[in-house]
Curated annotation (Swiss-Prot):
F-type ATPases have 2 components, F(1) - the catalytic core - and F(0) - the membrane proton channel. F(1) has five subunits: alpha(3), beta(3), gamma(1), delta(1), epsilon(1). F(0) has three main subunits: a(1), b(2) and c(10-14). The alpha and beta chains form an alternating ring which encloses part of the gamma chain. F(1) is attached to F(0) by a central stalk formed by the gamma and epsilon chains, while a peripheral stalk is formed by the delta and b chains. The gene is atpF. NCBIfam families: ATP_synt_b, PRK05759.1-3. F(1)F(0) ATP synthase produces ATP from ADP in the presence of a proton or sodium gradient. F-type ATPases consist of two structural domains, F(1) containing the extramembraneous catalytic core and F(0) containing the membrane proton channel, linked together by a central stalk and a peripheral stalk. During catalysis, ATP synthesis in the catalytic domain of F(1) is coupled via a rotary mechanism of the central stalk subunits to proton translocation. Component of the F(0) channel, it forms part of the peripheral stalk, linking F(1) to F(0). The keyword Metal-binding does not apply. This is ATP synthase subunit b. One of its GO terms (molecular function) is proton-transporting ATP synthase activity, rotational mechanism. InterPro entries: ATP_synth_B-like_membr_sf, ATP_synth_b/b'su_bac/chlpt, ATP_synth_F0_bsu_bac, ATP_synthase_B_chain. It comes from Bifidobacterium longum (strain NCC 2705).
Amino acid sequence: MMTQAASGIDLFIPEVYDIVWSLIILVIVAVFFYKFFMPKFNAIFDERAAKIQGNIAKAEQARKDADEAKAKYEAQLSTARVDAAKIRDDARAEASHIIADARSRAESDAAQITASAQRSIESQHQQAIVSLKGEVGALATALAGKILGAKLEDNDVQSSMIDSMIDDLGAKK
């Protein structure tokens, strides 16, 4: 028997036995691939996924740590600013207090110096008055003696005459 050669579209369609044997080989290769290669691929993929997840977790933890450090730094910075402002205000208050104390002491010292100078002036004034009374008295006695032509020897008379002349001079001022 002679077989007829295929023609037309039949040239491209395989025979049934070719399809069956191809399917059997495909199933064997798929089972072999599924049994031996897939677990290794899955292990590698799982390992990479775990590594990626670990890196993501590490990055997330690092971000949280950075946020916490930033918050802590900002809190410390805020506290430092508050402390600096408090120190500045305290220094200003202390400076005002020191200035007020220095001013008070200067005013007190000036008042003491003024009072001391006033007392000194008053003392010198009294000394000048006493000295002038003595000199005026001596001059008045000498003048009265020349006018009267006699020397006034009685101390009581001299004193009363000196006092009356000084009073007359004081009244004329």
